[in-house]
């Protein structure tokens, strides 16, 4: 039976609240401390304890920086909008290096970097720049690194397989940050909600209830849109916020059990494919005959990291019969400028063609099925009451490497095991 987590965000969500709730669910404190120590970060300490919010007993997780009595990043997170002090500037590569050099589990590393990427993408979109151009005084601060890695470590320790998220209850008004006075929800939160299928619900509470770090955690770990029609509660964890609100400032986390008799299936926490509706997209094209394969590969990576829906090269012949490549990028209207910036910066081209297209895309999801070789992720698409199944290449490759069997044999065997849904 998989561990299914439900986060009830009726007072919003922030990084420290998420960690607190997971610790209260039973995540191992010693494992967490050892994992954080392996990050080799200095200038902070963590405090874990209990406090009451509107009479409700809750766990708290505070990151205290040198020279600070308390760490008040909940709902006014230093997190993503520093108010001064400890001005650490790191880019996404620096943060990935810290994570990769740590001793946390591979699953925790993957999830930590996924959460950071969600924040980075949202901030890049807000500022109109590429992800690798953002210098994260926001998520690069020690307290935010600790919050995000701690959340990933706790989720891994609890062996969470499926995650459902309630509506994110957000405050209203404005909040002061390094960039000035911003409306609530702040741009990064709005971008995360829009890009990741989260639901926002505005309340009368003044100020910020949903922080970018909290929203990014929710976006990165969510695997299902709805709760089961009937479920049992196996365990409850309650995480405390810092601010005192008219209502209980808590985040409740439930380990639940689906009471319906379904075939066993899980959705991987690490990733899932978002459904794409019919609509418009943009195609950017340019012909390149004087670039190295390394630079073209690097450009493709940058484009995909910064939100391109698809990137591909086509071999062509240009004037004077010179062999060349046509670079094609498919993206949303909002990402056109970012894509152009990356192409001009990393290739030798001096011009880009672009045009708007319409497309029809089948809705799909990734689920996990049990096979004779173990669990395999399968992409499931539907069209005119027909369901199509496509085993994930990386899982087939892994099984082939583990068993020594041929690719087609494993692929065919997985295709026969259509026990999803």
Swiss-Prot record:
Keywords: Lyase, Nickel. GO terms for molecular function: lyase activity; nickel cation binding. InterPro entries: Ni_insertion (IPR002822). The keyword Transport does not apply. Transmembrane segments: none annotated. One of its GO terms (biological process) is protein maturation. It is an enzyme of class 4 (lyase). Its EC number is 4.99.1.12. It catalyses: Ni(II)-pyridinium-3,5-bisthiocarboxylate mononucleotide = pyridinium-3,5-bisthiocarboxylate mononucleotide + Ni(2+). Pfam families: Ni_insertion. Involved in the biosynthesis of a nickel-pincer cofactor ((SCS)Ni(II) pincer complex). Binds Ni(2+), and functions in nickel delivery to pyridinium-3,5-bisthiocarboxylic acid mononucleotide (P2TMN), to form the mature cofactor. Is thus probably required for the activation of nickel-pincer cofactor-dependent enzymes. NCBIfam families: nickel pincer cofactor biosynthesis protein LarC (TIGR00299). Belongs to the LarC family. PANTHER family: NICKEL INSERTION PROTEIN-RELATED, PYRIDINIUM-3,5-BISTHIOCARBOXYLIC ACID MONONUCLEOTIDE NICKEL INSERTION PROTEIN. This is Pyridinium-3,5-bisthiocarboxylic acid mononucleotide nickel insertion protein. It comes from Alkaliphilus metalliredigens (strain QYMF). The gene is larC.
């Amino acid at each position: 039976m998989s561990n299914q987590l439900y986060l009830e965000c009726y007072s919003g969500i922030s990084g420290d609240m998420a960690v607190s709730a997971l610790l209260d669910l039973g995540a191992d404190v010693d494992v967490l401390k050892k994992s954080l120590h392996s990050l080799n970060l200095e200038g902070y300490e963590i405090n874990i304890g209990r406090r009451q919010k509107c009479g409700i007993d809750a766990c708290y997780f505070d990151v205290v920086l040198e020279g600070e009595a308390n760490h008040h990043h909940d709902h006014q997170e230093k997190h993503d909008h520093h108010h001064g002090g400890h001005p650490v500037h790191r880019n996404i590569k620096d943060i990935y290096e810290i994570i990769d050099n740590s001793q946390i589990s591979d699953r925790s590393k993957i999830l930590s970097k996924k959460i950071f990427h969600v924040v980075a993408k949202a901030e890049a979109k807000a500022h109109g720049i590429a992800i690798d151009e953002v210098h994260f005084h926001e998520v690069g601060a020690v307290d935010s690194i600790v919050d995000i890695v701690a959340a990933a470590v706790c989720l891994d320790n609890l062996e969470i397989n499926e995650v459902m998220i309630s509506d994110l209850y957000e405050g209203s008004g404005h909040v002061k940050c390094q960039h000035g006075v911003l409306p609530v929800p702040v741009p990064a939160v709005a971008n995360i909600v829009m890009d990741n299928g989260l639901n926002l619900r505005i309340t009368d509470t003044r100020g910020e209830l949903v922080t970018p770090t909290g929203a990014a955690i929710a976006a990165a770990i969510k695997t299902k849109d709805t709760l089961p029609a009937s479920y049992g509660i196996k365990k409850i964890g309650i995480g405390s916020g810092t601010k005192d609100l008219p209502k209980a400032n808590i985040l409740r986390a439930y380990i639940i059990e689906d009471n319906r008799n379904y075939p066993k299936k899980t959705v991987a926490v690490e990733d899932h494919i978002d459904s794409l509706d019919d609509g418009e997209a943009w195609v950017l094209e340019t012909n390149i005959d004087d670039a190295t394969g390394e630079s073209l590969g690097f450009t493709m990576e940058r484009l995909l990291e910064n939100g391109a829906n698809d990137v591909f090269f086509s071999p062509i012949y240009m004037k004077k019969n010179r062999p060349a490549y046509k670079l094609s990028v498919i993206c949303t209207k909002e990402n056109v400028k970012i894509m152009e910036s990356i192409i001009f910066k990393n290739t030798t081209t001096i011009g880009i063609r672009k045009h708007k297209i319409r497309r029809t895309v089948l809705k799909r999801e990734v689920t996990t099925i049990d096979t004779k070789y173990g669990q395999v992720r399968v992409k499931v698409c539907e069209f005119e009451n027909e369901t199509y199944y496509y085993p994930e290449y990386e899982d087939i490759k892994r099984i082939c490497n583990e068993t020594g069997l041929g690719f087609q044999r494993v692929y065919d065997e997985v295709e026969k095991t259509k026990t999803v849904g």
